[in-house]
């Protein structure tokens, strides 16, 4: 089995036209978050500590230098050049990295906890990104006229409501426009920055890291606090890794080096030059870069870009949740496909609803991008540090390469994280609270599922005893049905409770019994031809077949489709599901909060009928009461 699972990925390379389309697609999905960071990053830096950072050439050179070298070290070196090589059959993201490391001996438990924490922090990022992005875009209206300020909140809420309202429709059609629109956005960023650089070429001094180091030496505390704003320039860096499975590493690298990185460097240099020449522009340097006649079109384009950035992180939340469900970190949820062509385009009603409520509350509580900026950094930097630790465990390289990574990437990331801890009281509590809630949910689900499996194992009949009873004379009293029955089951050495009840209580015995166990592999996809392992446990008169179905964490758990590939005669089978009614052994008021939380999640998770893509008319649910 292991040899079969290690089949190499195809070495074929897409033709140049295909690579170009993938690169354009990556611009629309992967780089939306980091591409909209110039809307608020520099403004946030100068508004730190109630505008204590003076707008002087030295401070501007130092801040811009810190921004450019943070982008270079974390995004270019770490993600684009290094981490994207740590793929799991082409898939990326922190849970893909965790799946690669699951069996690393004594690291296993730490890796699982780190992956859970990283996923939880990502959800904090997902809640904040749509809110801060859309708010920062609509705040450009105040540059046109201060009287527009009262419209910022209603417009932002309307845009966000529209984003979440269209989720059930999917993005297959409008998604094709994301790439060209984001290409226009990055060209606009570069085009707005270049004139200011030409007029004030001295800003090019910021390319030298000595300005960043000089600011750190001259004003260490101020520089430390500024790191909390500098990190905003690399929000979305994790998307380069997480979305690798959709586009491939090469198109992402091409898009970064040819379009995104040059555009970001030019716009940050341009904003720095503008602020030196016009200190009042620090209120919103992105929109002050544009001539007055182009500011309304820029606000419109920026709003569209932030909608695309929001869509990217929402889609990322769906994908991450699906991985978490398949890895048994979360209960089953309803998953709906919104595209017949793209398997990865999905919609999850529960996730969408929770995100919608969370984002609305965040916007109404914080009310401005400046206030939200304080909340943003902790989720981002926490994920950065965790990915670095997991990456070092994965590569297990020579000591001097590890030392270089720690010095040039690890230490700066830890400093970025430490700087953001100073903002906990100003909003940094938000991602921490979100992460804490999700960790409690995931740990409770794991804990409760383990207890259920232990209790269930005590009720289930050992497989060998069941097979012995099939040959015993007293089975003549059973009503035999000349059809096929399929029993999904979690283990291979016991009999499903639904089958036990079927024989014991219903007195039914089917001509052919198929017991299906889904084996979750730590890879994104298992090729259809390599999924099934079948063993005939009992022949005539009752045929018992055990099927182990090996699926990746991105594969659909579609039982009829997968079983058809094994034996088309099973198409008309009747499916029997075990439905557990869970009760706590303790009275309601005494039962612990963990018991109550788990029981609530178990009762409200999506039905297995829908998760396994079964027809209700061909599915029978057999109930069993279980006391925990």
From Swiss-Prot:
Keywords: Cell membrane, Ion transport, Membrane, Potassium, Potassium transport, Symport, Transmembrane, Transmembrane helix, Transport. Belongs to the HAK/KUP transporter (TC 2.A.72) family. It holds the Pfam family K_trans_C. It is found in: Cell membrane. It comes from Corynebacterium glutamicum (strain R). One of its GO terms (molecular function) is potassium ion transmembrane transporter activity. Transport of potassium into the cell. Likely operates as a K(+):H(+) symporter. It catalyses: K(+)(in) + H(+)(in) = K(+)(out) + H(+)(out). The lineage of its organism: Bacteria, Bacillati, Actinomycetota, Actinomycetes, Mycobacteriales. One of its GO terms (cellular component) is plasma membrane. This is Probable potassium transport system protein Kup. The keyword Transferase does not apply.
């Amino acid at each position: 089995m292991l040899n079969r699972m290690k089949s190499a990925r195809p070495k074929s390379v897409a033709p140049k036209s295909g690579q170009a389309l993938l690169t354009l697609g990556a611009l629309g999905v992967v780089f939306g978050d980091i591409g909209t960071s110039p809307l608020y990053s520099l403004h946030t830096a100068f508004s730190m500590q109630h505008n204590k950072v003076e707008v002087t050439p030295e401070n501007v050179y130092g801040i811009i230098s810190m921004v450019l070298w943070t982008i270079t070290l974390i995004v270019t070196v770490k993600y684009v050049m290094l981490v994207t090589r740590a793929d799991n059959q082409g898939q990326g993201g922190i849970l893909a990295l965790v799946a690669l490391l699951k069996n690393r001996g004594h690291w296993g438990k730490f890796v699982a906890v780190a992956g859970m924490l990283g996923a939880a922090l990502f959800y904090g990022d997902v809640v904040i990104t749509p809110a801060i992005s859309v708010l920062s875009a609509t705040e450009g209206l105040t540059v046109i006229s201060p009287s527009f300020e009262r419209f910022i909140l209603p417009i932002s809420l309307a845009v966000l409501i529209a984003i979440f309202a269209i989720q059930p429709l999917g993005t297959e059609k409008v998604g094709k426009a994301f790439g060209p629109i984001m290409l226009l956005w990055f060209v606009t960023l570069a085009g707005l920055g270049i004139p200011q650089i030409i007029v004030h070429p001295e800003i090019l001094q910021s390319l030298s890291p000595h300005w960043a180091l000089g600011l750190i030496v001259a004003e260490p505390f101020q520089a430390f606090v500024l790191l909390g704003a500098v990190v905003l320039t690399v929000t979305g860096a994790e998307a380069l890794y997480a979305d690798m499975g959709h586009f491939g590493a090469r198109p992402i690298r091409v898009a970064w080096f040819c379009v995104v990185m040059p555009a970001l460097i030019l716009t940050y240099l341009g904003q720095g030059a503008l602020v030196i020449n016009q200190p009042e522009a620090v209120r919103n340097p992105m929109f002050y870069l544009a001539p007055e006649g182009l500011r309304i079109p820029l606000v419109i384009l920026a709003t569209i870009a932030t909608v695309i950035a929001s869509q990217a992180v929402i889609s990322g939340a769906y994908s991450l949740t699906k991985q978490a469900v398949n890895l048994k970190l979360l209960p089953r949820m309803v998953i709906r496909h919104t595209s017949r062509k793209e398997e990865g385009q999905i919609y999850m009603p529960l996730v969408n609803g929770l995100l919608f409520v969370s984002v609305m509350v965040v916007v109404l509580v914080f009310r401005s991008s400046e206030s939200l900026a304080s909340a943003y950094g902790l989720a981002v930097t926490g994920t950065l540090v965790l990915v670095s630790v997991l990456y070092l465990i994965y590569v297990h390289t020579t000591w001097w390469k590890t030392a270089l990574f720690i010095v040039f990437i690890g230490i700066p990331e830890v400093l970025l994280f430490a700087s953001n801890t100073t903002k906990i009281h100003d909003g940094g509590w938000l991602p921490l609270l979100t992460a804490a809630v999700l960790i409690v949910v995931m740990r409770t689900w794991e804990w409760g599922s383990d207890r259920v499996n232990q209790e269930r194992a005590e009720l289930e009949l050992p497989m060998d005893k069941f097979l012995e009873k099939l040959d015993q004379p007293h089975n003549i009293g059973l009503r035999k049905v000349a059809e096929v029955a399929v029993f999904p089951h979690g283990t291979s050495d016991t009999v499903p409770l639904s089958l036990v009840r079927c024989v014991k209580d219903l007195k039914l015995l089917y001509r052919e019994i198929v017991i299906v166990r889904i084996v979750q592999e730590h890879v994104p996809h298992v090729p259809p031809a390599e999924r099934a392992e079948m063993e005939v446990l009992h022949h005539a008169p009752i045929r018992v077949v055990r099927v182990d179905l090996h699926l990746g964490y991105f594969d659909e758990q579609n039982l009829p489709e997968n079983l058809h590939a094994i034996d088309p005669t099973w198409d008309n089978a009747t499916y029997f599901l075990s439905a557990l009614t869970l009760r706590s052994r303790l009275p309601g008021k005494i039962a612990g909060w963990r018991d109550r939380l788990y029981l609530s999640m178990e009762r409200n998770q999506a039905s297995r009928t829908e998760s396994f893509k079964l027809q209700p008319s061909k599915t029978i649910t057999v109930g069993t009461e279980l006391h925990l």
